[in-house]
Amino acid sequence: MIAAVRGEVLDIALDHVVIEAAGVGYKVMATPATLATLRRGAEARLITAMIVREDSMTLYGFADSDARNLFLTLLGVSGIGPSIALGALAMYDGPTLRQAIGDGDVTALTRIPKVGKKTAELLVLTLRDKVGTSTSAGVASAGGHGIRGPVVEALVGLGFAQKQAEEATDKVLANEPEATTSSALRAALSMLGKK
């Protein structure tokens, strides 16, 4: 199992980064918030989880071991695969997600892409006693301007000018106030690609 990757960032995309370590380029899937902390050409270190399937071996990267452990805990729930678990961590940071599960906040959990009411209830039922809750974190609004910073940072990390990134992000959030970080980033990239 590959537990961590450290090396030069070769490429950053919407959903993954390529990090060269010991002459090998590793494609690591990650959340937009994690990707926003990386810079092309700079050295990076990600804690990883390697998921082996019949037809693929995929690395998922996280800023810290707490996020990775929460990801692996989510995978223990029936019906939750790596893409949904990563989507949950893209929607909410670790303490907020733990709080939502601990409080049984099904409404907040259904905001996660591909998670319906039954899956959200199963998450709460299965994980309520397994995840610690943070008393200081409330469930933040999934959309709105709380995602502006990570989207702008991700765009700048992809090589866009700060002003361009801010303008595109503001336009996207004005049109789609309930957008998630990943959908806002996609829309902003689409908008910037048309210029």
Swiss-Prot record:
Annotated GO CC locations: cytoplasm; Holliday junction helicase complex; Holliday junction resolvase complex
Keywords, sorted A to Z: Cytoplasm, DNA damage, DNA recombination, DNA repair, DNA-binding
Region (Domain II): 64-138
Superkingdom of origin organism: Bacteria
Keyword Manganese in annotation: no
Region (Flexible linker) location: 138-142
Region spans: Domain III: 143-195
Region (Domain I), start-end ranges: 1-63
Keyword Cell division tagged: no
Cited InterPro entries: DNA_helicase_Holl-junc_RuvA_I, NA-bd_OB-fold, RuvA, RuvA_2-like, RuvA_C, RuvA_C_sf
Record GO biological process: DNA recombination; DNA repair
Molecular functions (GO terms): ATP binding; four-way junction DNA binding; four-way junction helicase activity
SUPFAM superfamilies named among the record's database cross-references: DNA helicase RuvA subunit, C-terminal domain (SSF46929), Nucleic acid-binding proteins (SSF50249), RuvA domain 2-like (SSF47781)
Task performed by this protein: The RuvA-RuvB-RuvC complex processes Holliday junction (HJ) DNA during genetic recombination and DNA repair, while the RuvA-RuvB complex plays an important role in the rescue of blocked DNA replication forks via replication fork reversal (RFR). RuvA specifically binds to HJ cruciform DNA, conferring on it an open structure. The RuvB hexamer acts as an ATP-dependent pump, pulling dsDNA into and through the RuvAB complex. HJ branch migration allows RuvC to scan DNA until it finds its consensus sequence, where it cleaves and resolves the cruciform DNA.
Family membership noted in the UniProt record: Belongs to the RuvA family.
Domain comment quoted from the record: Has three domains with a flexible linker between the domains II and III and assumes an 'L' shape. Domain III is highly mobile and contacts RuvB.
Subunit: Homotetramer. Forms an RuvA(8)-RuvB(12)-Holliday junction (HJ) complex. HJ DNA is sandwiched between 2 RuvA tetramers; dsDNA enters through RuvA and exits via RuvB. An RuvB hexamer assembles on each DNA strand where it exits the tetramer. Each RuvB hexamer is contacted by two RuvA subunits (via domain III) on 2 adjacent RuvB subunits; this complex drives branch migration. In the full resolvosome a probable DNA-RuvA(4)-RuvB(12)-RuvC(2) complex forms which resolves the HJ.
Record-given protein name: Holliday junction branch migration complex subunit RuvA
Name of the encoding gene: ruvA
